[in-house]
Regions:
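A glycine-rich phosphate-binding loop feature that marks nucleotide/adenosyl-phosphate handling sites
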Residues: 2-4, 34-42, 84-95, 148-154, ...
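Short acidic (Asp/Glu) and glycine-rich catalytic loops that position anionic groups and cofactors
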Residues: 43-51, 79-80, 106-114, 136-140, ...
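Structural signal for hydrophobic packing residues in well-ordered secondary-structure cores
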Residues: 9-11, 18-29, 57, 61, ...
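Short glycine-rich or small-residue beta-strand-to-loop segments that form or flank ligand, phosphate
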Residues: 2-6, 52-54, 145, 229
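Conserved PLP-enzyme active-site core in the AAT-like
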Residues: 122-123, 153-311
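Flexible inter-domain linker/hinge segments
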Residues: 8-87, 91-99, 104-110
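Conserved N-terminal alpha-helix of the aminotransferase class I/II PLP-enzyme fold
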Residues: 43, 63-64, 108-149, 154
Length: 311
């Protein structure tokens, strides 16, 4: 298991944890040799030697009020959810209301001890269990894991599941991952990290996946195809009219379809990924649901999978 520590943790807390573990496994603790640095020191090569904050903007405004007005003038140039719907294709955002975010600050939710016994975490367990069932129903896939701490980790976990499936079947050649140009930008990085070779699929003039180009690549690599990663609707903001046909093509050669959930907010309640051919997808709970956008984390990027890819 792993233990997460933050800036509030101290030397005594760490030694208490080590003592607890030592007693648990019935071994004597030897903490004398453990040394803790009291301060963090940057290597000299990492220290900046040139002058900083030399731009005029840092000397033009001499008072807090002047600087505040300058910052707000810059902010007025932005178009955000405060002004209207955001035409941003890579992530379908919405406003997460304060009423929905407020419970995150409750100590009963945010300050539970990681070693709390099960009989003291029944409420927390029910929240997770209920959310697992709801997400499974929303996306139309059998199982859900909350282990990934971000959407990018959800991508990685889903692709690892696909890779592990093929390895368990002895199909070690299935290392090709098809990714359309219209897919979310993180997809190629996740695929490479998971051990796949990326093949780029072209798009037509209207932003759809070029089905002819996809067909040519599928036919060429056939039993080497491991997965197709797509974003639906795409980063161009386009709902692929041939989505079922695309999924069927990948399945016909034994591959899996991975859906990037960045734009899932645009289809929740209208359709389910599992119903139109998706085998595994992740969800960004800060986009589709209402956990905070940033703020130091950790976030949640749950990944959902079909029965075939479930543990």
């Amino acid at each position: 298991f792993g233990i997460s520590l933050d800036e509030l943790s101290n030397e005594k807390e760490i030694k208490d944890i080590l003592t607890f573990i030592a007693n648990l496994i019935e071994k004597e603790e030897d903490l004398e040799h453990i040394k803790f640095d009291k301060e963090f020191h940057l290597e000299s090569l990492a220290l900046r030697s040139s002058a900083w904050m030399q731009q005029d903007i840092f000397t033009n405004y001499q008072s807090e009020t002047e600087l505040m007005r300058y910052i707000f003038r810059l902010a007025e140039k932005d178009f955000s959810l405060v002004d209207g719907m955001m035409p941003l294709g890579s992530c379908t955002m919405k406003l997460n209301s304060a009423a929905e975010l407020n419970p995150v600050s409750w100590a009963n939710l945010s300050s539970m001890h990681p070693f709390s016994p099960p009989d003291q975490t029944k409420g927390y367990s029910k929240i997770i269990s209920d959310l697992e069932k709801w997400i499974s129903e929303i996306v139309g896939l059998k199982s859900v894991s909350f282990q990934p701490n971000a959407g990018s980790q959800g991508e990685f976990a889903g692709l690892l599941a696909i890779n592990s499936y093929f390895e368990s079947k002895g199909e070690l050649l299935r290392k090709k991952c098809l990714i359309p140009k219209s897919a979310h930008g993180t997809n190629p990085a996740s695929a490479v990290m998971a051990g796949f070779d990326v093949l780029t699929v072209e798009c037509d003039d209207e932003g759809n996946i070029d089905y002819q180009d996809l067909s040519i690549k599928v036919k060429k690599f056939d039993n080497q195809i491991g997965a197709l990663m797509l974003t639906y609707p795409s980063t161009h903001g386009v709902f692929e009219l041939q989505i079922r046909k695309i999924c069927d093509l990948i399945h016909s050669v034994g591959g899996f379809v991975y859906l990037d959930g960045a734009n899932l907010n645009a289809q929740v309640g209208l359709c389910k990924p599992g119903n139109y051919g998706v085998d595994v997808c992740h969800l960004n709970l800060h986009k589709t649901f209402c956990i905070p956008h940033g703020g130091g984390g950790p976030g949640v990027g749950p990944v959902a999978a079909s029965e075939t890819l479930s543990p």
